[in-house]
């Protein structure tokens, strides 16, 4: 009986989500998300070549090159990662693009473990993990060497396999 109720509730939820999603247009989505912003764009912003994109969310992809857990307490968890991507310039040079992303809150506590468990779950993020991130650019900051980076507030994160 309980299983049937759960199945019915799950079906109702999925149908409701489908109806809601079909009501959204591409224009509605583009009012919220700016797909033109990439790590390359954010690197140009940090260098002062473009304004900080604000008012919309961005979708970024790249590889985690640094993980710094700032607050280890679950309730007030805060981690800053450096996300990096790059491109070949000709046959000999590679240009890299980076930004910092802060993830805060208890929902990220299990995604960014302080130590890798013996059997990590697929949604866990470690050094060198490829990611897709949805976030909001918030500021320009500098690292210990004085290099400027755009700081993004991370809202959602998913490893790419």
Region locations from a protein language model:
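Bacterial N-terminal signal peptides that target proteins for export
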Residues: 1-9
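OB-fold and OB-like single-stranded nucleic-acid-recognition modules
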Residues: 21-161
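Bacterial N-terminal signal peptides
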Residues: 8-18
